[in-house]
């Protein structure tokens, strides 16, 4: 199965088509700078541009640089304060007319490591640290995510 994987970051928005079984990129990665200010409307315009770039009409898996609970942005992170309490998955779905699956960027990076990478079949605790515009973390115990750890916010 293929999905458009997208990473919304504090300085750039990146996307590529991904094989969900292997985690391999099927397309070249495309990057557009995160708009300043990174308001919901401005970011949604870049997300739409990404979807159009790939001529994509199916679901999008999207990582987001802050705490996300059930698709809702809890903190604004490195983005505009306007993001706080936005139901991000529905916002992008309405703006782009495709389903969106949204989660914290570091949690998703960790999920990739647990599923396909260095953490595969590891028992006990596995901690994944991401460093970009901000610092993120994904913590797993026996392969199960402990969501929204956000040690970069301590």
Model-inferred region functions:
Residues 2, 16-20, 27, 38-41, ...:
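Glycine/GP-enriched mid-protein hinge/lid loop-to-helix segment characteristic of carbohydrate kinases
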Residues 6, 21-33:
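Generic N-terminal amphipathic, Lys/Arg-enriched alpha-helix
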Residues 11:
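Conserved Rossmann-like nucleotide-cofactor binding loop
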Residues 15, 32, 62:
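Residue-level signal for inorganic ion chemistry
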Residues 18, 30-32, 74, 79, ...:
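Residue-level structural signal for beta-strand termini and adjacent loop
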């Amino acid at each position: 199965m293929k999905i458009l994987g997208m990473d919304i970051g504090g300085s750039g928005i990146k996307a590529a088509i991904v094989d969900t079984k292997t985690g391999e990129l099927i397309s070249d990665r495309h990057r557009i700078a995160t708009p300043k200010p990174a308001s919901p409307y401005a970011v949604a315009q870049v997300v739409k541009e990404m979807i159009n770039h790939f001529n994509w009409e199916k679901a999008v898996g999207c990582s987001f640089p802050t705490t996300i609970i059930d698709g809702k942005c809890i903190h604004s992170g490195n983005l505009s304060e306007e993001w706080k309490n936005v139901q991000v998955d529905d916002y992008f779905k309405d703006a782009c007319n495709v389903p969106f699956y949204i989660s914290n960027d570091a949690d998703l990076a960790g999920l990739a490591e647990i599923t396909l990478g260095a953490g595969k079949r590891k028992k006990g605790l596995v901690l994944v640290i991401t460093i970009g515009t901000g610092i993120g973390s994904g913590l797993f115990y026996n392969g199960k995510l402990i969501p929204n750890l956000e040690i970069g916010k301590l």
